[in-house]
């Protein structure tokens, strides 16, 4: 699985103009917030590796929320995250590990925890204007449509000014699989993602 667990030395990291002194605030899990997320679960979606039906999680939200809140908080504070990993064949030689992708099967409660962490991280990044306005992926209020609107605007502007316009469309092979985790974690540290949350993300990526 070398294509997935790419290693890269942080010694050769390019200089970055972003090195926040401000650290992301500690995430405090609230029972009410967990209960709300449980109530919003789609009961018709498949359950996770724990085989707990979504309908049970949704209908028992009030009873489950206090315990899950404690587990979520403990996971963040200790950096411990249980995993169940399965290899999924994509294409090519079935006898070569290169053509299999390891998938971490996540339980529904764990997905809720991931959502909470992601929301806190995005709030931190948005607050400090770390994300460029040109990044339209995986952001609230941004989408393929907003990216297309910007592209069309730039095209029409170039046409009006009678300037040359070149468009390069790139598709990186296994882009997500080959991100060096050491470099990613180093970058997150520069962005103020430190302490227990950084340790949790390290476990998540391992």
Name each model feature, range by range.
Residues 52-60, 135-140, 169-175:
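Conserved short loop/turn motifs at secondary-structure junctions
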Residues 55, 67, 116, 150, ...:
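Amphipathic alpha-helical interaction/coupling elements
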Residues 1-99, 104, 112, 192:
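Surface-exposed loop/turn segments and immediately adjacent short secondary-structure elements
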Residues 44-52, 95-105, 146-186:
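Conserved catalytic palm subdomain of right-hand nucleotidyl-transferase polymerases, strongest
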Residues 1-5, 98-127, 147-150, 173:
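Conserved pre-motif C helix in the palm subdomain of viral-like polymerases
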Residues 172-206:
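Conserved polymerase palm-domain catalytic core
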Residues 5, 38, 89, 109, ...:
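Residues that mediate protein self-association or partner binding, especially
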Residues 127-134:
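A short alpha-helix capping/helix-loop junction motif
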